[in-house]
């Protein structure tokens, strides 16, 4: 252990008092979530090729839950359940891009109100503070680095997350002289195993690259646990995956669509005072159990939760028989297909869908034989019960700003475009029967996973998108992606009709008309480009990218004052729009306002990373106006 880390740990250990408030001897809580981590790729779960010594050592010091399940196979919904103890219908964040309800208590709000210092450090944009999980945290570290083009990244390395977490421990340690009874709740979220896994051009298999990223996350977990070693006897550590990952099982790749156990089963390990070491719990549990269990362990309580306190199992006892709920609303929210809901009992697992599936999970743990046709009474009984879980209102997702939608899309999520502004999502009982069953769209879903994984480029990417559109012609998001892929390949003649086809699906996206404006501009049809931008602005009047493109068009038409006004307005709304800043400098130069052009170009150079591709062009402009 490094000397500085040891000092932090020893000092924190010395500060802990007030044993009366602790139910298990723990006065601190550390929650570690690893995105997209399958249980069967962790050593303690029997994976022969595992490279997870830190997680395995944590399991040896604590209790491993053999059958732990996420409530949703997607990042935001699963984490909202984990932090609140509520299933997705209860917290409202049922897909990425939605927002967790402010009325729902979380570990952070409960422990913060009890005097705990609270901090979270997350690694990816789906957990950005705007989506509602930052409530109750004194510090919510969601700042992501910028890419070479100056735009914000959508994720950051595990090492940066752990560095921030350890730095926060230093901070609260340095403040110990003013804190009489120090208790802390620290949550760290690591994104490494999420696609894309490493470099697809490396020649290594997808599984090998996935395991490489798990190993990276595990090394950083080891660093954090080392920093906490001296407070181990007073700290509950919970490590969990948020959901799994599919590699072809059931025809699925990646996650978010289906609710098979390949994407729902996750590792869940708890270690701390009063917890049996090396114990293994066979009873099925849900991530909704984490919040009530952790709160109780540190002397607090979570009210109005769907999960239960797992304290009996942590002490070697039994858990009651019960049923567990899970859902995926991504098929509806992202593609307009039927949502999927699952209910697990000791014997059965129902997947409620237009074509329901029923699995005997004791005899058929891989969910390979659908018994729905043979067990109709069980299907009806479980369907009635699953409907009770998902009876809560589902807020209609608000239209996301373009940057948010693009950042979610870059991580493989279509971000609500399929059903935006359709109130029927709030009553999701009816859409189940009159929408496509995701099972009947397996090949489309597999191609979508390929497209969003980062594994495909060039002609292979175009071919996959063409296959999606051929098999699912009403998929507006796929048509939009195909249109942009053709546009980027320089094929405006084929991109333009695809943009129109995307609009015909009812997709309410300004991106359609931004793409059309680009096509029209390339053939110098400025009047058509202006009409397209007017439609984009009608759809998204406050979208700074739309306003910036209006400014660029005005400059091309010779209206430099109008261009300057629009570009300045766009930059006031979003200072990160580097292309708008460059075009503002051009408009100043074309107006003869050389000093303002030079100042704008210098400001842009200061914002661009040293290795940004645009620097040469900006430097050329600066030389011309000086």
PLM regions: where:
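Bacterial N-terminal signal peptides
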Residues: 2-13
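Catalytic domains that recognize anionic headgroups
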Residues: 12-492, 497-500, 504-518, 522, ...
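Canonical positions in the second alpha-helix
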Residues: 467-468, 501-502, 535-536, 569-570, ...
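Structural marker of alpha-solenoid helical repeat scaffolds
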Residues: 471, 505-506, 539, 573, ...
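Boundary/linker segments of alpha-helical solenoid repeat arrays
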Residues: 476, 507-511, 544-545, 578-579, ...
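Ankyrin-repeat and related helical/solenoid repeat scaffolds used for protein-protein interactions
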Residues: 561, 565-602
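Terminal, low-structured helical/coil segments at or just beyond the last alpha-helical repeat
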Residues: 594-626
């Amino acid at each position: 252990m490094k000397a500085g880390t040891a000092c932090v740990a020893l000092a924190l250990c010395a500060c802990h008092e007030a044993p009366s408030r602790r139910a298990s001897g723990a006065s601190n809580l550390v929650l570690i979530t690893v995105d997209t981590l399958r249980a069967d790729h962790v050593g303690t779960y029997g994976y022969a090729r595992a490279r997870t010594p830190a997680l395995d050592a944590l399991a040896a010091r604590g209790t491993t839950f053999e059958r732990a399940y996420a409530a949703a196979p997607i990042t935001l919904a699963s984490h909202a359940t984990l932090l609140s103890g509520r299933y997705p219908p209860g917290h409202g964040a049922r897909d990425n891009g939605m927002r967790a309800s402010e009325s729902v208590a979380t570990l952070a709000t409960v422990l913060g109100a009890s005097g705990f210092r609270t901090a979270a450090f997350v690694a990816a944009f789906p957990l950005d503070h705007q989506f509602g999980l930052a409530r109750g945290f004194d510090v919510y570290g969601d700042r992501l680095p910028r890419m070479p083009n100056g735009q914000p990244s959508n994720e950051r390395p595990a090492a940066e997350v752990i560095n921030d977490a350890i730095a926060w421990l230093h901070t609260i340690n340095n403040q110990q002289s003013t804190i009489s009874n120090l208790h802390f709740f620290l949550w760290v979220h690591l994104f490494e195993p999420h696609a894309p896994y490493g470099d697809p051009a490396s020649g290594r298999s997808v599984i090998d690259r996935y395991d490489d990223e798990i190993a990276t996350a595990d090394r950083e977990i080891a660093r954090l646990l080392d920093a906490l070693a001296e407070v181990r006897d007073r700290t509950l550590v919970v490590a969990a995956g948020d959901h799994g990952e599919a590699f072809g099982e059931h025809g699925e790749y990646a996650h978010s669509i289906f609710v098979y156990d390949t994407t729902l089963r996750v590792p869940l390990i708890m270690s701390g005072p009063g917890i049996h070491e090396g114990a293994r719990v066979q009873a099925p549990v849900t991530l909704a159990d984490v919040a009530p269990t952790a709160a109780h362990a540190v002397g607090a309580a979570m009210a109005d939760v769907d999960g239960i306190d797992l304290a009996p199992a942590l002490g070697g006892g039994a858990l009651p028989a019960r049923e567990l709920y899970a859902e995926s609303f991504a098929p509806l929210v992202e593609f307009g297909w039927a949502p999927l809901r699952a209910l697990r009992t000791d014997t059965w697992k129902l997947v409620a869908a237009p074509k329901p599936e029923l699995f005997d999970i004791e005899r058929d743990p891989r969910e390979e034989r659908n018994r729905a046709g043979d067990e109709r009474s069980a299907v009806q009984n479980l369907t009635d019960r699953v409907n009770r879980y998902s009876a809560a209102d589902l807020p209609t997702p608000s239209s996301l700003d373009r940057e948010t939608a693009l950042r979610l899309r870059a991580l493989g999520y279509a971000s609500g475009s399929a059903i935006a502004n359709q109130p029927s999502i709030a009553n999701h009982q009816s859409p189940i029967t009159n929408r496509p069953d995701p099972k009947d769209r397996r090949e489309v879903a597999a191609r979508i996973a390929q497209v969003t994984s980062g594994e495909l480029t060039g002609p292979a990417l175009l071919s996959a998108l063409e296959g999606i559109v051929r098999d699912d012609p009403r998929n507006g998001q796929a048509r939009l992606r195909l249109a942009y892929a053709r546009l980027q390949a320089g094929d405006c003649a084929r991109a333009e009709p695809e943009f129109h086809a995307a609009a015909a699906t009812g997709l309410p996206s300004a991106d359609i008309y931004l793409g059309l404006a680009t096509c029209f501009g390339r053939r110098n049809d400025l009047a058509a480009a202006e009409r397209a931008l007017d439609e984009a602005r009608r759809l998204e009047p406050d979208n700074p990218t739309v306003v910036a493109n209006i400014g660029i068009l005005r400059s091309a038409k010779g209206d430099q004052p109008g261009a300057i006004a629009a570009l300045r307005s766009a930059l006031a709304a979003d200072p990160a729009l580097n292309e708008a800043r460059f075009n503002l400098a051009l408009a100043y130069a074309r107006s003869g306002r050389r000093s303002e052009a030079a100042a704008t170009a210098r400001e842009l150079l200061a914002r661009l990373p040293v290795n940004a591709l645009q620097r040469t062009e900006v430097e050329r402009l600066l030389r011309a106006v000086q």
